[in-house]
Design a protein with these regions (language model features):
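Beta-strand signatures of extracellular beta-sandwich domains
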Residues: 85-89, 211-215, 251
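Short edge beta-strand/loop segments characteristic of extracellular beta-sandwich folds
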Residues: 60, 71-79, 181-189, 197-202
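Short acidic/polar inter-strand loop motif in beta-rich domains
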Residues: 130-137, 253-262
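Sec/Tat signal peptide C-region and signal peptidase I cleavage site
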Residues: 19-25
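N-terminal edge beta-strand
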Residues: 40-70, 158-179
Length: 271
């Protein structure tokens, strides 16, 4: 969608949504968070209506993150056949839109797992776009702090070692035509622009994965548009439907022109 490109940027989002919600009494804080969400939703979706749901999409997130730079998020879509794409929005992050994932014909859109950075106590919204163009959202509140400024490694050079290397893990048992699990791991520092180089004490310029495409054979599984809220060395769990021989191919690119691709042999499927 064309509306996505201008919003991927810390400065623009921060200008529109002026800072995280301050600590306050519960009712005041809830009202501030709802106001912030409405601003974000209006901007992201060009004033399209976003309806609440407890059935089309569900979000599983820790109430308190053990590591704010590596927060596991699981999205579940019980009515998966209706879902075209999902958006993951971390309301109080400097750039709230963490990822937009579009499901292709080789995907099973029942579940999606991501690791993200969370900068402060915040609502995390999951928005499902249905195939008829409607938007539905649900949210979870996560307590975390400092995830966007946490170092990606002991030094920038160390964090960039092996950049673009990929691994793919498949379920042990795969059957033709039935959903199968896969987990993609990509080495990349995903510099947020908010991290301080531990040696120079200067801020490291932003450099993050902005597009990833996963395909199986000649069909797309996932198209992923990302931003600074995806974690260092992103890990994504998803389901696909094996038909034919594959292989599974991943193409990834970042904001500094880096491009990587790799193909993976899928374990033989049984009938």
């Amino acid at each position: 969608m064309e509306i996505l490109r201008p919003i991927f940027g810390v400065a623009l989002i921060t200008a529109i949504c002026a800072g995280p919600v301050p600590a306050a009494d519960s009712s005041q804080a809830d009202a501030k968070r709802e106001e912030r969400w409405q601003l974000i939703a209006d901007y992201l979706f060009d004033d399209r209506e976003v309806l609440p749901t407890d059935s089309l999409i569900k979000i599983d997130a820790p109430k308190r993150a053990q590591d704010a730079a590596l927060v596991p998020i699981t999205l579940t879509m019980p009515q998966k056949d209706k879902i075209k794409s999902v958006y993951l929005v971390i309301d109080d992050n400097p750039a709230p839109l963490a990822a937009h994932v579009t499901f292709g014909p080789a995907a099973d859109s029942g579940t999606l797992q991501l690791r993200v950075r969370i900068d402060t106590y915040t609502n995390v919204h999951a928005v499902a776009e249905t195939k008829d163009g409607k938007l539905f959202s649900t949210a979870a509140f996560v307590k975390a702090s400092g995830g966007c400024s946490a170092p990606s490694g002991p030094s920038d050079a160390e964090a960039m070692k092996g950049m673009g290397e990929m691994r793919m893990k498949f379920a042990e048992s795969i059957q033709q035509g039935k959903p199968a699990e896969a987990t993609l791991m990509i080495r990349h520092p995903n510099f947020s622009g908010m991290q301080m180089n531990q040696l120079t004490r200067h801020f490291t310029p932003a450099r993050y994965l902005e597009k990833m495409t996963v395909s199986y054979g000649d069909q797309t599984v996932l198209d992923i548009v990302g931003d600074i809220s995806l974690s260092t060395n992103p890990v994504m769990g998803f389901n696909f439907v094996p038909r034919g021989d594959g292989p599974m191919k991943v193409v990834a690119s970042d904001t500094k022109g880096g491009r990587w691709e790799q193909s993976f042999k899928v374990p033989p499927a049984t009938n």
